[in-house]
Amino acid sequence: MAGPGAASSATAPPVLTRGVPVTQTPSHPTALTAAAPRIDTRHELGCTNTATVDEISLNGAPVVDGPAPDKDLAPLSMSVGTTQLWRFVNAATDAFLDLALIDEAGKPVPIQVLARDGSPMIDDAGHPTDSPLTTEPQLVPPAGRIEFLVSAPALDQKVYLVSHAVDTGCTGDSVPERRLGILTALPYTADAAQQAQVPPRTTSPNMFAGLLSRKTEHKRVIAFAEYPRPGDEDQTDFYIAERRPGVALVPYQMNGAPTITVPADSVEEWTVENWTNEVHAFHIHQVHFRVLSVNGQSVVDGALLDTDTVPAATAIAAPPPAAVVPAPRAPVAPASPAPADVTAASQVAPGQVRIKLFFPESLAGDIPFHCHLVDHEDNGMMGVLRVNPRGGRNPP
């Protein structure tokens, strides 16, 4: 990535590269079994969240729940007057993170985002975009990555790396605000200056540059759904399927047929729907996509991503009889009866993320896509996209 090299100059502060992985640890031996967590799908529209808080760590240091003293936080340090490039990966099994830096007074500290999910911030033509300083929290779902520049605080100051609370839906996990680490400054030394001289690096052309200007050749609707396992309502099966006539919900099978087949060098637009009462982390291997809209709201200058958060479904009041609104189509419309506090005049509006994808010839073969909440993935919320070489059959 060109960012580190570009930041090392006579006038710019020196830059170091830091890896900041976050991992999740089970609280007990059965925490990651097929039966955990148990999701009450009988009350899709009126549920109560009783989920516990996931345990996570930062660079191996456990993250403490609730207000944490400085001594219990993962230590982060850098020389005063320098800038570091932090490469942050959310390697937790199902913990969403909403990252920010704040000072001791609770004031946000600006960062400069250079890349998401391993792809530099570029426009559709492949040119680097301006990356202004921002104090906006950065939502990083499981499997998400973000790279950003951080400037050292003063010698007598402390800065906290925090994750703000995330609403994951009424059946989702509990994600409270937590301090992840504490950043302090060390005296500036010549050794630190020499260590910070990162040589410039070049990048190969991005194969997904020009994606937005390509003609869309096919549109699909991809649906997330959850239902109690037949005969065992204590166990939930998770599904991801293309929503079109004749397609049934079937949990992923290792040796099953591909969920979707596309010809190489094709361009598609997917509407990823979430019919459940918790957010999901949509992830596709090998491919980067551009987000076009979220819940109908257009996204401008979105980053190239391979992972994004799909909002939870919501209960909405039925429109007046004169209005014409398409009803949710089977088989992914919620099948369980609504609880007593939800009237028959309500219906479900799925959360939606609309994305654009390109499948180059070099990626011919099978490409998994799935929810990156590992318990969901392991219990069936996964599909396979097959990219046929030129001359292969067209998508169904």
Model-derived features with residue positions:
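Alpha-helical secondary-structure segments
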Residues: 5, 84-85, 269
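Histidine- and aromatic-rich segments of cupredoxin/plastocyanin-like copper-binding domains
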Residues: 16-20, 31-203, 299-301
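Active-site pocket scaffolds in enzymes
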Residues: 109-136, 180, 215-396
